[in-house]
């Protein structure tokens, strides 16, 4: 199934990559790989992950404190947020 990033989710992802790049390029690459793996797992089995708010589901990234929040649309997956787990819960709700 194809996927689309909400523009604000794409910005969050880019900001996180930038942050990790400033720490170490290797860490940034590991983060990119972790998010790509998370999106792959979502695409393989989108209904596997629990709904956290109505039709919004969350899949946690491995080795990083981030979750990918998404909805399953008719013919694609909409990624609503690439959320750091210590960020204010629910900030992404207006994106649905």
Sequence positions of predicted segments:
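Short proline/glycine- and basic residue-enriched helix-capping loop/turn segments at helix->loop/beta transitions
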Residues: 39-43
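Enriched for short, Lys/Arg-rich terminal
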Residues: 67, 71-96
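Arg/Lys-rich, positively charged N-terminal/basic patches that mediate binding to nucleic acids
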Residues: 1-32
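Solvent-exposed interaction patches of small proteins and small membrane subunits
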Residues: 18, 28-30, 50, 55, ...
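Basic/aromatic recognition patch in beta-strand/loop cores that engages polyanionic ligands
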Residues: 47-77
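Short, conserved catalytic or interaction motifs in soluble domains
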Residues: 22, 47, 84
């Amino acid at each position: 199934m194809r996927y689309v990033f909400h523009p604000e989710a794409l910005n969050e992802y880019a900001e996180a990559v930038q942050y990790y790049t400033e720490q170490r390029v290797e860490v940034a690459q590991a983060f990119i790989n972790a998010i790509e793996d998370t999106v792959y797992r979502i695409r393989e089995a989108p209904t596997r992950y629990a709904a956290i708010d109505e039709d919004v589901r969350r899949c946690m990234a491995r080795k990083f404190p981030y979750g990918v929040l998404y909805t399953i649309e008719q013919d694609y997956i909409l990624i609503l947020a690439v959320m750091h787990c210590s960020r204010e819960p629910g900030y992404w709700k207006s994106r649905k």
